[in-house]
Amino acid sequence: IKNDISCTYFLDADYPNYLKHCIDGPILIFQKGNIDLNNRKIISVVGTRNVTSYGIAFCEKFISDVAPLNPIIVSGFAYGIDICIQREAVKNGLQTIGCLAHGLNQIYPKVHAKYQAEVLKNGGFYTEFWSTSNPERENFLKRNRIIAGVSEATVVVESAEKGGSLVT
C-alpha cells in the first residue's frame, strides 16, 4: 500500500463478486478507504450533472427510505446526482463509494475535494485507472460499467435522452 492506495486483482477474494460476472470487468481495481463490496447490499445511483430540484428531492427521499437497510451507495462522485446522492448517504450515516474516471491521486471535479474526507471516514474510492491517469472523456463511460457492475441494482435518477447515465 502506497499513498493509502491498495490494489485488488480479479482473482483475489476481496474483488467485488458482482463485477467478476461482468464480461468486461477490469483485471485490477485500485482503492482508497474502507471498502468491502462483498458482504453488504449495494445500490448504485447515477444521473444527470444538471440536477433539478426534483433530483435533489429524490436523492433525499431515496436515501431516507433505504437507510434502515444500511446499503452501500455507489456513484461516480461527479457533478449533479452523483455528488448529491453521496452527500445524502454520508449525512445519513451510510457507507458510500465513489467510482472515479481517473487515478486516485486527484479528485475531479476539484470542487468535490472538500467532500473527499467525508467519504473516506466511512467509505472510499474505486478506480481501474493508474494513479497518474487524468479524467479523460472516454474514461467516464468505462467507469460507468464498474458503477453498475459492483451492485445489485442501479437507479437512474435523471438523465437526458442521450446522457451517459443511460449506458450505465
Per-region residue spans from a language model:
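Glycine-biased, small-residue-rich flexible motifs in mid-sequence functional cores and linkers
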Residues: 3, 7-168
